[in-house]
Each structure stands twice: as C-alpha cells, then as structure tokens.
A protein has these predicted regions:
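Thiol-based oxidoreductase modules, predominantly thioredoxin-like and allied folds used
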Residues: 5-6, 25-39, 49
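Structural micro-motif
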Residues: 45-56
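Residues that form or immediately flank small-molecule/cofactor binding pockets and catalytic motifs
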Residues: 9, 34, 74
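Local sequence-structure signature of Cys/Sec-based thiol-disulfide redox active-site neighborhoods
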Residues: 1-28
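Short phosphate-engaging motifs
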Residues: 12, 38, 75
C-alpha cells in the first residue's frame, strides 16, 4: 500500500493520487493542508524537499514498516516497473 502525503492544491500530488487509482493499487491520502509546521516536519523526517512525499507500507503479522518511494516521478517509474 502506498501513502501519499499531499497538499490539495498541488498538481503533482493530485496526479499521484490519480495514478494510483488508474493503476488499481491500494493507497492512502494524507492531507497535509492544515499545518505548515507539520508539513515541514514530514519533509525533514523523510529528507524530501517537495510534495507529494510517497511511501510504501509493508505489513507483517506483527509489524509494519514504511519506505520512501519519492515523489510523483518515482511513483510513476515504480508502477511502470510493476506492469512489466
């Protein structure tokens, strides 16, 4: 499952969401509109300078982990590689 940390007026954020829908992959949209301080915190945590910040969640019976995919371009490349 992908997590899309995005802002509602960000074209690349909306394109990432649309790409997940078109590709029929599970995703969750995390709206980052409301707190500029939290947006900056998330960018710092993931060491990514722009939105969207896209991660992939991995689940096991007892744990979960979240790995950075990148932005829209990186998501697009990853989904294209899954199609092959």
């Amino acid at each position: 499952m992908y997590m899309i940390y995005g802002v509602s007026d960000c074209p690349h954020c909306l394109r990432a969401q649309a790409l997940c829908m078109e590709s029929d992959v599970d995703y969750a949209w995390v709206m980052m509109d409301w707190s500029k301080q939290y947006r900056e915190h998330i960018k710092s945590d993931w060491k990514w300078k722009t939105y969207p910040i896209i991660t992939k969640m991995y689940f096991t019976e007892r744990t979960s982990s979240e790995v950075l995919v990148g932005g829209f371009d990186e998501l697009q490349l990853e989904l294209l590689s899954l199609d092959q």
